[in-house]
A protein has these predicted regions:
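C-terminal, charged low-complexity interaction regions
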Residues: 10-11, 20-23, 28-73, 261-423
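Histidine-centered nuclease catalytic patch
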Residues: 161-185, 200-202
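Low-complexity, highly charged intrinsically disordered N-terminal segments
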Residues: 59-138
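Short Cys/His-rich Zn2+-coordinating modules
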Residues: 131-144, 168-176
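Short flanking/linker segments adjacent to small metal-binding domains or redox-active Cys/His motifs
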Residues: 232-259
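Polybasic, low-complexity binding patches
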Residues: 196-238
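Short, flexible, mixed-charge glycine/proline-rich loop motifs
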Residues: 138-152, 178-183
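Short cysteine-rich clusters marking metal-coordination/redox-active sites
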Residues: 155-158, 189-192
Length: 423
């Protein structure tokens, strides 16, 4: 028996062995109910997280803790969310289309006018489809992309097959270090998985070191508790403590900026080695990982560039949005492939989102018909791609440098909110 617990940023499909109809009944009784016209009690599948709900889940844990070990997973799942978070509980199998429709509902249900929000969401999808084919993996469910039979696999990157290469490892499409546990690329051989994992993907993980520490995202290797001048502690009650050591010069600058702007801004230093261009290459590798095997041919020059066998110059800038107005527990990967004859648009665009940072970037190919250095290029992209709107905070960043950086410097800004914002 499978019970689906659906949130807007996560879908958990928990399988319960044996015949546990009583357990299922108790789980469904967590949800609101009503009497139909014939007087029969009907249970809805939708509700919101609340104190009462958590109390009832604790009772279910106490009742079934010796019989249904999965009950602890259910409680841990709900503890991740704040009160008021919408969710569905649906028993049995659920299709990808149903999952997407329910997710659209969850994303918009708390909006002032959810119907209008869902309408706008569909309009955005329609606008994108006029220029691009849109492919996305949201990380809500575990997916394996590419040939399932290991004996028939051909690596999408090096084009080698067995017995020349092996496919024994689990190749995560986007690094575990960025929170991915669910999106897998079958057709990435062990040799390429290791090479990318210790190369461009390692640089990308290093570049996002502070975000990984702040959100306690653990990959294969343990995280340190801080940087050169700060330490981060995740307390047992769910809070985050940050201790920062400032030099005399930094203290003077902090006090001066505080008087002028009224904001609290602390410099953070992390000793991490990375090459900016490798961050860009890793982002491209992530989005290529969600394509079907048959869609890879146009991106051979991209792979050659990722592997250092081809120079693509100039490289376009990358659009970065941080923070976003949402938080993702699972990374979300999207790639758009041009279907129209609009020569003013790039052939392919990638979008990578995790925690509360988003990247929108051109997937570079050698024979693209657009000029990557054209200053108007991103303005044209904004018209075709409503996801990218400079006015909501996207900024363009240059990741073209192949010079190794030994330190990451960033700022931690605190903005005082009004009492009305806290209500």
């Amino acid at each position: 028996m499978i019970i689906n617990f659906l949130f807007k940023d996560h879908a958990a499909h928990i399988e319960i062995g044996g015949d546990f109809q009583e357990f299922l009944s108790d789980i469904m009784n967590l949800l609101p109910s009503f009497l139909d016209k014939d007087g029969y009690r009907q249970v809805t599948t939708f509700s919101h997280v609340s104190e009462k709900l958590m109390e009832n889940i604790d009772k279910i844990v106490e009742k079934y803790k010796k019989r249904v070990i999965e009950v602890y997973k259910i409680r841990s799942l709900f503890k991740q969310y704040n009160q008021g978070e919408p969710f569905f509980i649906i028993p049995g199998a659920i299709s990808k289309e149903e999952l997407e429709n329910l997710n659209s509902y969850l994303v918009t249900v708390n909006d002032p006018d959810p119907e209008e929000s869902r309408k706008k969401l569909e309009e955005l999808k329609s606008q994108i489809s006029r220029s691009y084919r849109f492919i996305q993996q949201s990380g809500l469910v575990r997916v394996s992309i590419g040939e399932a039979d290991k004996s028939k696999r051909v690596c999408r990157y090096c084009h080698k097959s067995t017995p020349e290469v092996t496919f024994k490892q689990i190749a995560h499409t986007i690094s575990e270090a960025l929170g991915n546990k669910t999106i897998i690329t079958n057709t990435e051989c062990d040799e390429c998985n290791n090479r990318y994992g210790t190369g461009i993907e390692m640089d990308c993980a290093n570049y996002h070191n502070f975000i990984r520490r702040f959100y306690n995202i653990r990959g294969k290797t343990p995280l340190k508790d801080g940087g050169t001048n700060f330490k981060i502690e995740h307390t047992t009650d769910g809070n985050i403590k940050i201790g920062i050591t400032l030099t005399d010069a930094e203290i003077s600058e902090f006090e001066r900026d505080k008087k002028i702007t009224g904001k609290l801004c602390f410099p953070l230093h992390v000793n991490q080695k990375f090459r900016p261009v490798n961050v860009y290459k890793a982002l491209c590798k992530y989005v290529l990982g969600i394509l079907d095997d048959d869609d890879m041919a146009p991106f051979q020059s991209t792979i050659d560039w990722m592997d250092g066998n081809l120079q693509i110059s100039p490289l376009p800038k990358v659009a970065v949005l941080f923070p976003t107005n949402f938080h993702l527990n699972n990374p979300r990967i999207s790639i758009l492939i041009r279907t129209s004859e609009q020569e003013e648009l790039p052939y392919s665009i990638g979008i990578v989102e995790f925690t509360d940072i988003a990247y929108c970037f051109i997937v570079p190919i050698q024979d693209d018909i657009v000029n990557y250095s054209d200053e108007e290029l991103w303005n044209r992209i904004a018209k075709a791609l409503p996801i990218y709107k400079p006015q909501i905070g996207w900024r363009l960043k240059d990741f073209s440098s192949d010079i190794q950086q030994d330190e990451i410097r960033s700022n931690l800004n605190f903005v005082q909110r009004s009492k009305q914002e806290d209500k």
